[in-house]
């Protein structure tokens, strides 16, 4: 399968298709859950998940960045893998400047038994990956252990007092 980015310049009345196409050369690799985010510097991040089959027990969040999203011809960085798991919602930037990426690796009890083992059982949670250098490096920070979870879809919100909420649909 492929992921296609379409662009509208008239408020959504029409779209130019194929501004960006993500396609994996391996037909067994699935590309899904795209997400667009403009960071505080105006850089457009296009993220997606890749996995072998439906659930390979690892998945992976990939990104490509466009430094000038208002250009007529969008130029994208080479794709890079930033996290294990799936990211269905946008990152946030906290008041301290940390960039937080909500990801998840589905647990073995999700009803979708992983087809492979990667030693990531300690990451089968609703996770937070963080960057302290504006996205140049990103690492696992922590997780929430949601009872009776299956297909986690999590997001992070910073409250006025600086504490964080993780909202998870499972």
Describe each region flagged by the PLM.
Residues 1-170:
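Asp-box/BNR beta-propeller blade signature and adjacent active/binding-site loops
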């Amino acid at each position: 399968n492929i992921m296609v980015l379409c662009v509208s310049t008239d408020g959504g009345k029409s779209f130019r298709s194929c501004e960006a196409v993500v396609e994996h050369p391996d037909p067994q690799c699935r590309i899904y859950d795209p997400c667009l985010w403009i960071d505080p510097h105006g850089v457009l991040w296009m993220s997606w998940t890749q996995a072998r089959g439906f659930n390979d027990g690892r998945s992976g969040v990939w990104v490509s960045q466009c430094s000038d999203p208002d250009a007529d011809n969008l130029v994208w960085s080479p794709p890079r893998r930033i996290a294990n798991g799936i990211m269905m919602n946008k990152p946030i930037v906290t008041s301290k400047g940390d960039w937080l990426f909500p990801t998840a690796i589905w647990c073995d009890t999700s009803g979708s038994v992983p087809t492979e083992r990667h030693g990531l059982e300690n990451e089968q949670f609703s996770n937070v990956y963080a960057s302290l250098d504006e996205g140049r490096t990103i690492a696992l920070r922590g997780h929430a252990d949601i009872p009776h979870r299956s297909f986690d879809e999590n997001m992070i919100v910073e409250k006025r007092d600086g504490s964080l909420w993780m909202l998870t649909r499972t």
